[in-house]
Amino acid sequence: MNRVSPDPGMHPRPGRSRRGSLRQRLRNVCTRRRIVIAGALLLGAAVLALLVPQAWYFHQVRQLAEHNPDSTAFMDLRRAQDGGTNIDFRWVDYTEIAPGLRRAVVAAEDGGFMAHNGFEWAAMGEAWRDWREADRPLRGASTISQQLAKNLFLSEERSLRRKLQEAAITWMLESQLDKRRILELYLNVIEWGDGVFGAEAAAQRFYGVRASELDTWQAAVLAARIPRPRYYHRHGETTFLIRRAARIEQWAAHARIP
């Protein structure tokens, strides 16, 4: 009886099978390693894209402790929007701004200025709920520090992304500058009318006096202009503006300032 010899190709040798399995495992390891490296690179790029702008903003804020700004994002925006509108911007020191104007602005825009760390959380919560529940644009509820962040570096866009960037810059301002410097910057760079930026330019444009010479009523009217400076420049002292100024003049007597 003849024995049939087994075909060598039917049963691979154990050594060859183990080598093939090892190569496959090595391929899998290399593939996973490439995926991990690619993911790490993408994550690193994303983190870098977030951190580089923040580092730039932080450097700019640190500079503001010692140097007065020559211009702001809002001034540049007005120049671009209005075809080269002449910007009336005259810097004055904090002590050259009438105490009545300092008090009126704090009373009108941010009564808790001296107490908070840059944010009024209750007001921000209400604005957030309005945005989420009613699909409305993100509304104000901004402190003086938040308004300063926006005026110096950002735009008028009302979006979540811009609000988050505003919050980051606000934290930088509050951590690097004292309240007096923040208020000094604010009073010098905010818009008071068409192309009119800062308390000195506003006092001279609307009342023909220096910022240090404003009386309490003039200060209250200027503070009342802040939410809609260009509108009031074009329409003058409306009934609503006068009524609001009267309330601000009363509130200002109790406002805390640096």
What are these regions (language model features)?
Residues 2-258:
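Juxtamembrane regions of bacterial inner-membrane/periplasmic proteins
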